[in-house]
Amino acid sequence: MMNNSNLVFKAIGFDADDTLWNNETFFQETQSKFRKILQEYPLDEIDQKLLNIEKHNLQVYGYGIKGFILSLIETSIEISDQQINGKQIGNILDLGKKCFSNQFIYLKMLKQLCGIFIKNTFYY
């Protein structure tokens, strides 16, 4: 068993999205708009196909907006049996561009939390 009393941390990192600001809302809004682009296909099939493709693509693209948008495009191609048109793909790309321009809303108590860490940090 390890003795934790000798542990010294040089840095603490935060995975910022959904930890320091609300990011998930943007993904949900984008997915809702994506469903409208593919409204001629069954909603439950779209959602399930997207979820499966996103999970598979995590190994390739990782997390984030770019991987999400590429997964939306791949989903649209598969769900439409390659019948999706260029205008619809363009609309999906526009959704992605909008994701990058969203203003983040910092989660409550962020300033207080950062202040606590700064106040209790020891510099060597």
Located regions from the model:
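A metal-dependent, Asp-based hydrolase signature
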Residues: E40, D44, H56-K98
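Substrate-recognition element of Asp-dependent hydrolases with the DxDx(T/V) motif
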Residues: G86-L95, C99-N102, L110-Y124
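Active-site neighborhood of HAD-like aspartate-dependent phosphohydrolases
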Residues: M2-L51
